Amino acid sequence: MRLYLASTSPARLALLRQVGIEPVVVPSHVDEEAAVRLATDSNGELDASAMVTLLARLKAEAILGQRPDGEEIDGVILGGDSAFELGGDIYGKPHEPQIARERWLEQRGKTGTLHSGHWIIEVKNGQAARALGATAHASVEFASDISDSEIDAYVAERVEPEFGRVERDVPAFSCHVNIQPSGASAHSIDHAACQAATAE
């Protein structure tokens, strides 16, 4: 069974490869801001867990019907999204070095929560059969003794501040951030069915 990764995230691709999975990468092209805005208008403010689960689902669903390598998708689609929550504020990925630096300075000496949402869809002959979503949470503690120069080194390496994306040669991250997983909450359509699908 093939796994289709609905993401161009280097971190997610690296994590899958670390456990021996070589997925088919299919970009999803979801307008995340518009999707969150629409959901908020319809259902009220989303918390971080609901937001990453929603975006993970939309990314997975966005590639249904696509034909990577000229063939219908047949296997399992994986969509993912993550967000960092600190002091009641939710942060997405910083797309500019200056924003990344400002966030490091703000987060120094504080503890926040990283929310990671995933959504998988079993696809047979190009049609969705079953789906399952879950959100994991990790407590992220930023040490107070990290220097401005170490933060600058981290930003200069352009390391994506996302769980699983840690460059070994950037001590600003590996030495000054303590990540403690705190379990996962599931948003499921059919747990048993999806587990069976991924085991086939």
Q: What is each PLM-predicted segment?
A:
Residues V36-T40, E85-L86, A128-H137, N178-S182:
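Acidic/polar active-site rim loop that often engages polyanionic ligands
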Residues M1-V76, S149, A153-E157, Q195-T198:
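N-terminal polybasic phosphate/anion-binding patch
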Residues R101-L105, S116-S139:
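Anionic-ligand binding region
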Residues S82-E85, L114-V123, E167:
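Short beta-strand scaffold segments in enzyme catalytic cores
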Residues S82-T113:
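Active-site-adjacent loop/tail segments of enzyme domains
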